[in-house]
Amino acid sequence: KNGARLVKEFPHIPGIDFSGTVVESKSEKFKEGDEIIQTGWRVGEIYFGGYSQFAKVNSNFLVKKPKGITSRQAMMLGTAGMTAIQCAFTTKQTREVLLLGEKVNDVIVTGASGGVGSIAVMILSKMGCNVTAATTKPNEEYLKSLGANNIIKSGELDKEARPLDKGLYDGAVDTVGGNILANILTHVKPNGIVAACGNASSIKLNTTV
C-alpha cells in the first residue's frame, strides 16, 4: 500500500513473530526442547515467517522465552509491543536524559487503536504522561480505558501541514506517517521528541524547516 512494499519474492510465508519449541538445533545457543521467541530481523519479509507449523531460522534471531510467561502472552506483545516500548521510552526518556530532566508531559499517539499505538498509549500513561490519542475509529471508551486523556480524530491532522503551528506536545509516537506526521511536527514544542515508526498513510513526508 502507498508504495511501501515489504515482500518482494513469492511464494512466501508471512508472520513477523513466532514463539515455539526447538525440535532440532545446529546452534550451541539452543537445544531441543528450548522454548524460544522470535521478533524482528525482517522475518516474514525477506525470510519465511511464522505462519507455519515449523520454521527454520537463524539462531541469532532467537531469544529464550522468559519463565513466567506463556508463548501466547509473548505473542500478545510481539513486534508491535517491542516497537511501542522503544518509541515510548525514546519519546520520554531521551528528552529527560539529554536535556537534564526537562519533563515530557503532553504526548500524542497516532494510530492509537492499532497494535503499536494502543500499547504506546498504555505505556506513556503509566509513565505519567498526558496522552492524546488520534484515531479513525469510534472507540473513545476503549482508548480511555488504556489511559488516554484526550481523543481526537486522525482526520484533523490528515491535511497539508502549515510550516509552523501552535506547540501542543512535548513528544509524539507516530505510527501512520504522511500528512499526519507532517502536522505533528508543526505542533511539537521546542526540544520535543518524535518517534516515527509507521507509514500506513504514506511513505512521503512533506514538511519544511
Segment roles from a protein language model:
Residues L157-G167:
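Short amphipathic alpha-helix with an adjacent loop that forms part of the alpha/beta core around
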Residues N179-V209:
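Glycine-rich phosphate-binding loop and adjacent beta-alpha segment
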Residues S19, I37-Q38, K56, I108, ...:
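Hydrophobic beta-strand signal
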Residues M75-E156:
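Mid-domain Rossmann-like dinucleotide-binding core that forms the NAD(H)/NADP(H) cofactor-binding site
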Residues G44-S59:
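A structural motif shared across PLP-dependent enzymes of the aminotransferase-like
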Residues D34-I36, F54, K126, N130, ...:
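Residue-level marker of beta-strand positions
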Residues N2-V43:
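Glycine-rich beta-strand-centered segment in the early N-terminal region that forms part
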